[in-house]
Protein backbone atom coordinates (compact mmCIF):
# COMPACT_ATOMS: atom_id res chain seq x y z
CA UNK A 1 0.00 0.00 0.00
CA UNK A 2 1.35 3.38 -1.02
CA UNK A 3 1.00 6.12 1.59
CA UNK A 4 1.05 9.73 0.43
CA UNK A 5 3.15 11.83 2.78
CA UNK A 6 3.33 14.83 0.45
CA UNK A 7 1.24 17.08 2.70
CA UNK A 8 3.29 16.17 5.76
CA UNK A 9 6.51 16.87 3.87
CA UNK A 10 5.15 20.19 2.61
CA UNK A 11 4.15 21.16 6.15
CA UNK A 12 7.65 20.40 7.38
CA UNK A 13 9.10 22.57 4.64
CA UNK A 14 6.78 25.53 5.28
CA UNK A 15 7.59 25.35 8.98
CA UNK A 16 11.23 26.02 8.07
CA UNK A 17 10.33 29.40 6.59
CA UNK A 18 11.60 32.34 8.63
CA UNK A 19 11.95 36.02 7.86
CA UNK A 20 15.59 36.36 6.86
CA UNK A 21 15.79 39.75 5.13
CA UNK A 22 15.86 42.03 8.15
CA UNK A 23 16.84 45.56 7.26
CA UNK A 24 20.36 46.17 8.56
CA UNK A 25 19.51 49.35 10.45
CA UNK A 26 16.92 47.39 12.43
CA UNK A 27 19.07 44.35 13.17
CA UNK A 28 21.85 46.65 14.37
CA UNK A 29 19.47 48.08 16.98
CA UNK A 30 19.51 44.78 18.82
CA UNK A 31 23.14 45.50 19.78
CA UNK A 32 22.39 48.91 21.31
CA UNK A 33 22.32 49.59 25.04
CA UNK A 34 19.17 50.69 26.83
CA UNK A 35 19.13 54.38 27.72
CA UNK A 36 16.36 54.56 30.32
CA UNK A 37 14.71 51.22 30.95
CA UNK A 38 16.19 48.30 32.84
CA UNK A 39 15.10 45.14 31.03
CA UNK A 40 16.32 41.59 31.53
CA UNK A 41 15.69 39.88 28.20
CA UNK A 42 16.07 36.43 29.76
CA UNK A 43 13.13 37.06 32.10
CA UNK A 44 10.69 38.18 29.41
CA UNK A 45 7.75 35.81 28.78
CA UNK A 46 8.84 33.62 25.87
CA UNK A 47 5.76 32.42 24.01
CA UNK A 48 6.50 30.91 20.62
CA UNK A 49 4.32 31.89 17.66
CA UNK A 50 2.10 29.35 15.93
CA UNK A 51 3.79 27.06 13.42
CA UNK A 52 3.51 28.25 9.83
CA UNK A 53 1.63 25.10 8.81
CA UNK A 54 -0.78 25.14 11.75
CA UNK A 55 -4.54 25.52 11.72
CA UNK A 56 -4.07 28.52 14.02
CA UNK A 57 -1.97 30.28 11.38
CA UNK A 58 -4.61 29.52 8.76
CA UNK A 59 -7.27 31.07 11.00
CA UNK A 60 -5.07 34.12 11.50
CA UNK A 61 -4.71 34.54 7.74
CA UNK A 62 -8.49 34.30 7.42
CA UNK A 63 -8.82 37.09 10.00
CA UNK A 64 -6.38 39.24 8.03
CA UNK A 65 -8.36 38.68 4.84
CA UNK A 66 -11.65 39.46 6.59
CA UNK A 67 -10.36 42.70 8.12
CA UNK A 68 -8.94 43.82 4.80
CA UNK A 69 -12.36 43.37 3.21
CA UNK A 70 -14.35 44.96 6.03
CA UNK A 71 -12.26 47.94 7.20
CA UNK A 72 -11.39 50.76 4.83
CA UNK A 73 -9.50 53.52 6.66
CA UNK A 74 -8.00 56.44 4.77
CA UNK A 75 -4.49 56.20 3.33
CA UNK A 76 -3.60 59.17 5.51
CA UNK A 77 -4.52 57.26 8.66
CA UNK A 78 -2.54 54.20 7.62
CA UNK A 79 0.50 56.36 6.82
CA UNK A 80 0.20 58.11 10.17
CA UNK A 81 0.07 54.80 12.02
CA UNK A 82 3.12 53.57 10.13
CA UNK A 83 5.18 56.73 10.50
CA UNK A 84 4.54 57.52 14.16
CA UNK A 85 2.62 54.87 16.11
CA UNK A 86 3.30 56.32 19.56
CA UNK A 87 2.62 59.83 18.25
CA UNK A 88 -0.93 58.76 17.39
CA UNK A 89 -1.47 58.45 21.14
CA UNK A 90 0.74 61.22 22.48
CA UNK A 91 -0.56 63.89 20.11
CA UNK A 92 -4.00 63.36 21.62
CA UNK A 93 -2.56 63.11 25.13
CA UNK A 94 -0.89 66.51 24.84
CA UNK A 95 -4.20 68.12 23.88
CA UNK A 96 -6.18 66.99 26.94
CA UNK A 97 -4.47 69.04 29.63
CA UNK A 98 -2.20 66.31 31.03
CA UNK A 99 -0.35 66.87 34.31
CA UNK A 100 2.93 66.38 32.44
CA UNK A 101 3.54 66.89 28.70
CA UNK A 102 4.89 64.04 26.59
CA UNK A 103 8.14 65.91 25.88
CA UNK A 104 8.84 65.87 29.62
CA UNK A 105 8.36 62.09 29.81
CA UNK A 106 11.51 61.42 27.74
CA UNK A 107 9.51 59.68 25.02
CA UNK A 108 12.37 59.55 22.52
CA UNK A 109 14.63 57.46 24.77
CA UNK A 110 11.76 55.31 26.02
CA UNK A 111 10.75 54.40 22.47
CA UNK A 112 14.39 53.80 21.56
CA UNK A 113 14.60 51.29 24.40
CA UNK A 114 11.33 49.70 23.29
CA UNK A 115 12.72 49.28 19.77
CA UNK A 116 15.87 47.61 21.10
CA UNK A 117 13.85 45.16 23.17
CA UNK A 118 11.31 44.40 20.43
CA UNK A 119 13.94 43.79 17.74
CA UNK A 120 15.70 41.38 20.11
CA UNK A 121 12.43 39.48 20.45
CA UNK A 122 11.84 39.55 16.70
CA UNK A 123 15.31 38.19 15.96
CA UNK A 124 14.85 35.51 18.62
CA UNK A 125 11.69 34.10 17.03
CA UNK A 126 12.30 34.99 13.37
CA UNK A 127 8.64 34.51 12.51
CA UNK A 128 7.68 34.64 8.84
CA UNK A 129 5.46 37.46 7.63
CA UNK A 130 1.90 36.62 6.49
CA UNK A 131 2.74 36.85 2.77
CA UNK A 132 5.36 34.13 3.15
CA UNK A 133 2.88 31.46 4.22
CA UNK A 134 -0.46 32.55 2.73
CA UNK A 135 -0.01 30.48 -0.45
CA UNK A 136 0.46 27.30 1.60
CA UNK A 137 -2.94 27.86 3.21
CA UNK A 138 -4.55 28.97 -0.08
CA UNK A 139 -5.67 32.26 1.44
CA UNK A 140 -5.27 35.42 -0.58
CA UNK A 141 -4.21 38.50 1.33
CA UNK A 142 -2.99 41.91 0.23
CA UNK A 143 0.17 43.33 1.72
CA UNK A 144 2.07 46.58 1.47
CA UNK A 145 5.05 45.49 -0.62
CA UNK A 146 7.09 48.66 -0.13
CA UNK A 147 6.56 48.57 3.63
CA UNK A 148 7.40 44.87 3.70
CA UNK A 149 10.53 44.91 1.56
CA UNK A 150 12.27 48.15 2.46
CA UNK A 151 10.07 49.88 5.04
CA UNK A 152 9.04 49.40 8.64
CA UNK A 153 8.02 45.76 8.13
CA UNK A 154 11.46 44.59 6.97
CA UNK A 155 11.92 42.55 10.15
CA UNK A 156 10.53 39.28 11.52
CA UNK A 157 6.81 39.45 12.24
CA UNK A 158 6.58 38.54 15.93
CA UNK A 159 5.92 40.66 17.97
CA UNK A 160 4.62 43.82 16.29
CA UNK A 161 6.84 46.79 17.06
CA UNK A 162 4.23 49.34 15.99
CA UNK A 163 1.60 47.79 18.22
CA UNK A 164 4.06 47.67 21.11
CA UNK A 165 4.94 51.35 20.63
CA UNK A 166 1.30 52.43 20.46
CA UNK A 167 0.23 50.41 23.50
CA UNK A 168 3.29 51.47 25.50
CA UNK A 169 2.35 55.07 24.72
CA UNK A 170 -1.26 54.37 25.72
CA UNK A 171 -0.23 52.81 29.03
CA UNK A 172 2.14 55.68 29.85
CA UNK A 173 -0.52 58.22 28.92
CA UNK A 174 -3.07 56.32 31.03
CA UNK A 175 -0.72 56.36 34.00
CA UNK A 176 -0.57 60.15 33.88
CA UNK A 177 -4.16 60.75 32.75
CA UNK A 178 -6.10 57.66 33.95
CA UNK A 179 -9.56 59.09 33.29
CA UNK A 180 -8.86 58.87 29.53
CA UNK A 181 -7.44 55.34 29.52
CA UNK A 182 -10.19 54.02 27.23
CA UNK A 183 -9.50 56.71 24.63
CA UNK A 184 -5.74 56.10 24.69
CA UNK A 185 -6.22 52.34 24.29
CA UNK A 186 -8.68 52.87 21.44
CA UNK A 187 -6.04 54.87 19.57
CA UNK A 188 -3.47 52.15 20.19
CA UNK A 189 -5.90 49.56 18.87
CA UNK A 190 -6.27 51.53 15.63
CA UNK A 191 -2.50 51.28 15.16
CA UNK A 192 -2.64 47.54 15.84
CA UNK A 193 -5.45 47.04 13.32
CA UNK A 194 -3.56 49.10 10.74
CA UNK A 195 -0.74 46.54 10.74
CA UNK A 196 -3.21 43.79 9.94
CA UNK A 197 -4.90 45.95 7.31
CA UNK A 198 -1.50 46.46 5.66
CA UNK A 199 -1.09 42.67 5.60
CA UNK A 200 2.25 42.78 7.41
CA UNK A 201 1.24 41.24 10.75
CA UNK A 202 -0.71 38.35 12.21
CA UNK A 203 -3.20 39.11 15.02
CA UNK A 204 -1.04 37.14 17.46
CA UNK A 205 1.89 39.46 16.70
CA UNK A 206 -0.24 42.22 18.20
CA UNK A 207 -1.39 40.11 21.13
CA UNK A 208 2.17 39.22 22.09
CA UNK A 209 3.27 42.85 21.73
CA UNK A 210 0.55 43.94 24.16
CA UNK A 211 1.58 41.22 26.62
CA UNK A 212 5.18 42.43 26.52
CA UNK A 213 4.06 46.00 27.14
CA UNK A 214 2.00 44.95 30.15
CA UNK A 215 4.49 42.51 31.66
CA UNK A 216 7.89 43.94 30.72
CA UNK A 217 7.92 47.47 29.33
CA UNK A 218 5.37 49.18 31.56
CA UNK A 219 6.80 47.71 34.79
CA UNK A 220 10.25 48.87 33.62
CA UNK A 221 8.87 52.36 33.01
CA UNK A 222 7.20 52.53 36.43
CA UNK A 223 10.51 51.60 38.05
CA UNK A 224 12.07 54.72 36.53
CA UNK A 225 9.56 56.87 38.42
CA UNK A 226 10.59 55.64 41.86
Where are these regions (language model features)?
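Short, active-site-adjacent segments that bind or coordinate small-molecule cofactors and metal centers
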Residues: 208
